[in-house]
Amino acid sequence: MKLPNYYEDPNTLHVGTCENRSYYIPYGQDLNSHATLLSGDWRFGYYPYPEAVPADFINPDFDDSSMDTIPVPSCWQCHGYDYHQYTNVNYPIPFDPPYVPKENASGAYRTTFTLSAEAAKQRNFLYFEGVDSCFYVWVNGKFVGYSQVSHSSSEFEISSFVNEGTNTLAVLVLKWCDGTYLEDQDKLRMSGIFRDVLLLTRPKSFVRDYTVRTFLKDGGAGVVRVSVEADGEVSPVLTLCDADKNPVGEAVLTDGVYEFTVSNAKLWTAETPYLYTLTISTADEVITQAVGIREVYIKDGIVYVNGQNLKFRGTNRHDSDPVTGYTISKEQAIRDLTLMKQFNFNAIRTSHYPNAPWFTELCDRYGFYVIAESDIEMHGYLSTYHSDRENTLGLLDEGGVFTEAVLDRVQRNVIRDKNHPCVLIWSLGNEAGFGYAYQNAGRWTKEYDPTRLTHYESSTWDHSNRFDKSMLDLYSRMYATTEEVDSYFAEEGPKKPFIQCEFVHAMGNGPGDIEDYYQQIMKYDGFCGGFVWEWCDHAVNQGVAENGKTMYGYGGDFGEYPHDGNFCMDGLVYPDRTPHTGVYEWKNVVRPVRARLVDAHKVTLALKNMLDFTDMADAITLSYECKADGELLCSGEIAVPSTAPHTESEVTIPVTLPKTAADCYLKLTYLTKTAHELVPAGHEVGFDQFLLSGSAVRRLNSVTDEATAPTVTEGDRFLTVSGEGFTYQYDTFTGIFSSLERGGETISMDYSIFRAPTDNDRNIREEWERANYHHSQTRTYTTEYAVDGQTVQITSTVNLCTVTVQSIMKFTVIWTIDGAGTITCKIDAKRNTDMPYLPRFGVELTLPKSWQQVSYLGYGPQECYIDKHHLAWFDAFESTVENMHEDYIKPQENGNHYHCRKASVGNGTNGVTAYAATSFDFSVSNYSDYELAVKKHNYELEESDFVTMHLDYKNSGVGSNSCGPQLLPQYQMNDKEFEWEYQLKF
């Protein structure tokens, strides 16, 4: 099929399309919709390039009986055509803008629709909500038009092409076009008609578009201004009703603008998403629009909504599903929004394109602030050879090739969603540099809609400030370090509000720095918040493995090139929306109430209301429990005092502390007081826990007077330590017990610094591998032992080393074994600070496979780390080895428990228990560290025939360095010198 080559012509973005308008569905006066959904099963033909498409497939009499069928909407890769591809930065095609490969996969779609005689006389429009990447449209064999911009809507008037009765619609979709260079988003690349297609039948004259803007007046009044644009002669009548359908005021028409004044207006916020209903009626049509009265502005470098300093607790969200790909239903979107609301999110950035047009309607209704982002990302230019240019990302922009396209995409985003109160910020796009095109697009945006904020992070790449950025209201960064944030606010002079449009990269086991960033968000009024990268793991469901696990595919699993591996697996939830532990960390860090201990003896606490618009007493109920080493002392509920947003109130908990050496912890749990559409009453929104009494250092169990010392037998390498019912082999070469036998079962020990790298270890991993940490070993310099009346004491000086490079650490270890077989270990270590920080330092125990029962006194029940433990609390927990495993799709270090006092693994008869004078990190797994390190998918994992148990002096934090900053020093196992004492009982 010979096509006009619009798809490689940046000067021809659209042919035959209607002027942009806001999204709405018109109804007749009888309240019947004027929209017909054309979605369903369409005829489909897949071809390797446009020239292979039959030229007559567009004709009504074309025999399409041999064509396949495909659901519309859908992505054709999800139905067996073409192949999936995941790439982040790199373009999937040769870089030759505006040209794309000649072998350009093409999908030919056909369907029919029927018009009555009356409908055929009206005006008819086709409305495409989303097509990737570009498409040509024919009706009844006649060319209607062409459009692109995958995630924005395109509308065509087809009145002159339709007939009474059956009409044939043919659409040809191309995989790539010149717009592909502007749609280089970090996602799986898919194609097709992936959103709904609507047929609109409208009267000869109608309301074409309208604009709603709201303002606040002193005294609590709200103003709603509506401008209406008509196609033809109409006399619109406007009414505004409250949520109970009662009219509120009358519209006053001045200079073509309708204005409602609402006394004592109920304001829209994410916490209180109150909506009025605007109705625009003509003789033949009715249009309704939800209206939220709210105002957003900046004063003195601070973002305000309705007069209150606002903090965004947000996430970046792609349209993504492991089965349906880009095609997302309302039910799927509501599933996401439900989880977000339940995990304390209040904001969404539509990364990096407009979501389905009804998505902002849902955000209006359920209460989310939205950064509405245009369908632009061009960071693939970074892979080209232009390293001498400061503004590499902006080269495509500066060249002028896509100047018109950038403006077009920004306009389509803004105009479509302009009437939604949830949209506080327009984002011009993502990672596409800053040049003339963005300067012009930014100016247009601010002029068109001065009532909202304008955002664009990539303006920071214009280091020499060659271009005007005055229209940008926010200083936006990605993954700025905590030091950079402090530096920004330390500078003198006026400044824009600071926002992290992406931060705390949530890939795999992580993120681990949420609390550190949140402390800064609350410290600086001008830090208006951040958006986690990102909401969900992107993957393709490839079926079920023999072991019953879902096989999720990511980059490289589809035979594609180029690809970026599992970098798409970077969400807070799994592809099926099962929460990662990281989203629990987020939930509790951004909890709506934060307590601080004022008086531990009286158990008086100050409760701070972290909500922005709601009195704490109206939103929260509070329960408490106090435990001593996991044993319940008391529990109850406390009345929540009336507390305005961002203020504190004190409460006293009726707790009598026992005289005990145990750790006494008070836990406060915050629950929702009333139901929200997405959150039930009584839903836990967070907790705080405080140590009321206890000892940082505990004395370990001492030897009883009647104990008899074990015997020691020397060999050429091993010391055999024997006592009643046990035999231990101590390796004088390595400085640790090679075997511990008791009750017919044997375990072994080794020093351990290696862990299966997490996704967030991907950068430091190179240093660890260069340092050969994965080949570490120990050798002793000296070993001595002594036997007194009750114990055996073995002392070794040890070098922790590896091949090729220098010593990692040197330490003295003292092992004390009593007659009952209890082992006490004391280590005095000095680390070589020329070497990278360690993944961990501790001991690894290899246990019998039958030992599957686990109990521990420490932080749980979720996995937790030194920088990711706010999701957990200190308590006594019981579990199983299987349940201690967090099944990341790409296997990695997991299942750690921070700040443990005690941990036991066994089978009910035999087992091992660890104690520490201070605390330790603990984990146990059916998989070896090596297995977790080398396997690419969780369904490939094979269980060991033993159980691996780790006791660590310190396990380094997980951070977010897969894309974010380096792990903060305080969370690294970088101690220059340290002492550690622990005890093992069998």
Residue ranges and their predicted role:
Residues 8, 75-78, 83, 92-99, ...:
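An acidic-aromatic loop/edge-strand motif
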Residues 1-18, 25-28, 43-49, 53, ...:
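Accessory beta-strand-rich segments of carbohydrate-active enzymes
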Residues 1-30, 181, 186, 285-606, ...:
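Extended substrate-binding grooves/exosites of carbohydrate-active enzymes
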